[in-house]
Amino acid sequence: MHALHSNPTMPALLDVAVAADIQVSVVYYKYRTSPFYIHSICLITGVKLCNSTPLLYTIIYIASLKMNYNGAEGLEFGGGNTKVDPSVLSELPKGCRVVATESHGVSFWANTGRIDVELLDGTLQKFFIKVISEEQGKYMMHGEFESMKTIHTLMPDFAPRPIAWGTYKSIPNTHFFLCDYRDMIDEMPDPHKFASRLAALHQNSKSPNGKFGFHLTTYSGNLPQMNEWEDSWEVYFAKCLRNALDLELEAKGDDPEFHVLVPIIFEKVIPRLLRPLETEGRSVKPSLVHGDLWYANSGIDVDSDESLIFDACCFYAHNEYEFGQWRPVCNKFGAEYLATYHSYAQISAPVEDYDGRLDLYKLRFNTHVSALFIESETLREQMLGDMRDLVKRYG
């Protein structure tokens, strides 16, 4: 998830009330930066929301949500610290001097910061860094680096330049992702600028072997996606959805409706909506997708006024898959963005199945997010509602 701008000095005392039997993590956001993002998180997680210091801070309580970060003593960002791990320093410009580090942004899964350096010629340069712990964190950082590298190589003006990923030398089992720092404003991008770039990403990308998938596992949040190569989009998507359902079941346990709905989804709904894309002379081009392109994973560059995307978990997919993430209630990429996108890239045939396909793709996203937020029954009910609707229409 996107690491939003945050104020490094948080209120020491906050007037909040929390049920005593709920284990919580407290995440602070500067309210005026992105009120929509705050409320989006509340909608998708079912968390409690309250305001402290009107129009300045919002506190989100996320039940039992564990960050994948165990701390990095002596190397935390901010507080006057200018020390960075040798592995990170080796990836910064040769001969530079670190003049400041700051905690920058908020992430559910990682620690995020900004590193300011002075180059040999006296100019200043800034970098964004994300740090995460444990073996799983290594795979998460590798997947994000490869995703952002693939996007940046294809469209360098559409994503911050990824520089490196690696493992700290001074702290065991601590991993990082490093990229150029881009100062961004948290506003919706111009539909035409954004849609034209996204369409170009989809249209100009080329799967290295002509198949659907990716060359390594990528992570949406802190959970893996199924990226093994497949010739058929229908087969690939079914495996992706099955993986997400397995993760959701592991997180929240069984539900009687699963035994009724899931077989129909796989035996009837998926073939009904996806098989026509690859029959009667039709085919699906494997396009590079961001993989988690909701509003909070985009921004507008302060200097260029151009739209940017980040926090990618890429793979090669049907381009319309991207818009499954634009269907849930937390979405802010509305009909105008879809219509503008399709002025650059036409809807796949059969056109009459378009809405159904997007709702099927939405199920994949909603299943994954339900697996991420274990305590949220709202998200499971949302997922089951998606299944009921699809079964009623296409089962």
Residue positions per predicted region:
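Active-site Asp-x-Gly
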Residues: 229-242, 246-247, 283-288, 295-355, ...
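ATP-binding pocket architecture of kinase catalytic cores
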Residues: 104-231
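An alpha-helical support segment within catalytic cores of ATP-dependent transferases
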Residues: 80-92, 167-170, 206-290, 301-304
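ATP/Mg2+ or Mg2+-diphosphate-binding catalytic cores
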Residues: 71, 369-395
